[in-house]
Amino acid sequence: MKNNNRPIFPFTAIVGQEEMKLALLLNIVDPKIGGVMIMGDRGTGKSTTIRALADLLPEIDIVANDPFNSHPTDIELMSDNVRQLKENGEEISLIQKKVPMIDLPLGATEDRVCGTIDIEKALTEGVKAFEPGLLAQANRGILYVDEVNLLDDHLVDILLDSAASGWNTVEREGISIRHPARFVLVGSGNPEEGELRPQLLDRFGMHAEIRTVKDPTLRVQIVEERSEFDRSPEDFLQEYKLQQEVLRQRIINAQQQLNNVQLNYEIKVKISQVCSELDVDGLRGDIVTNRAAKALAAFEGRDEVTVDDVLRIITLCLRHRLRKDPLEEIDSGQKVEKVFQRIFSNL
């Protein structure tokens, strides 16, 4: 766990990498988008950006002394113990805490991730003795897996299952325990170290590609800002305090606005037409694109999705779902844009 006293580089001070920042923000507005896979060169600020986002987010109300960060009113985000207390009409004390940001280490075992059941205690004392894992700690927060392409496929499957369902189930020797595990899954990796299997890649809601900044003036700006932050973190954070507060409020407003956003039928049909023409397997691409477009409209403070909203997110939602053709020279992102322009040209 990170030390909360250590200053964290502010999200609004991060230069460039707009694609990654947008994908992360939209997943915070609507966690049901299904997470982000960030592929790119080493040293491009992936970890810095994710930590900065977690630090930016408003504090959340959680039930005190609860290992699952249970929500005080939402049953979907509440552990069985807390639900039992509520049903019995008992008083529940609350505390406020930062949105959890959990790092999943590469060598983590399944027990460390999912939690363990003390079988001996369960059999002798008749109680379900459960030791929560990282998924419990990540409930209502962000779970970050660096170099996810080097993680065991079975573990990636478990993470994706929990992220999609919002629950983690642990079964040992006929004893079963279930707890809420609703989190934004963020994976990052370097394409040189190997790709994820297509069926795993497809289950990430969005896929952002980032490159090392080439523009010399931007590079100088990034280096100078980092030096300034390292020299005097307090002054640097003060400088960005207002911008951080404005963005934090935008996120809160977008989360509240999300359910009111409309996506008209014609645009939905066009989105599905793009997916169909690109030969995207299944319907996950259609669903995620619809969700992301609504999240973007809410983030921009609108209650209706525009064609421009779809243009900004469709590549992020579809590029990783295209079948790889080794003979094709066009990049998958450009392919998505090309088909989008043709199908949406008459709207």
Curated annotation (Swiss-Prot):
Belongs to the Mg-chelatase subunits D/I family. Its EC number is 6.6.1.1. Transmembrane segments: none annotated. CDD domains: AAA. The keyword Cell membrane does not apply. GO terms for cellular component: cyanelle. This is Magnesium-chelatase subunit ChlI. Pathway: Porphyrin-containing compound metabolism; chlorophyll biosynthesis. One of its GO terms (molecular function) is ATP binding. It is found in: Plastid, Cyanelle. Pfam families: AAA_lid_2, Mg_chelatase. It comes from Cyanophora paradoxa. NCBIfam families: BchI-ChlI. It comes from the Eukaryota. ATP binds at residues 41-48. SUPFAM superfamilies: P-loop containing nucleoside triphosphate hydrolases. InterPro entries: AAA+_ATPase, CHLI-like, ChlI/MoxR_AAA_lid, Mg_chelatase_ATPase-isu, Mg_chelatse_chII-like_cat_dom, P-loop_NTPase. Its main location: plastid. GO terms for biological process: chlorophyll biosynthetic process; photosynthesis. It catalyses: protoporphyrin IX + Mg(2+) + ATP + H2O = Mg-protoporphyrin IX + ADP + phosphate + 3 H(+). Keywords: ATP-binding, Chlorophyll biosynthesis, Cyanelle, Ligase, Nucleotide-binding, Photosynthesis, Plastid. Involved in chlorophyll biosynthesis; introduces a magnesium ion into protoporphyrin IX to yield Mg-protoporphyrin IX. Gene3D superfamilies: Magnesium chelatase subunit I, C-Terminal domain, P-loop containing nucleotide triphosphate hydrolases.
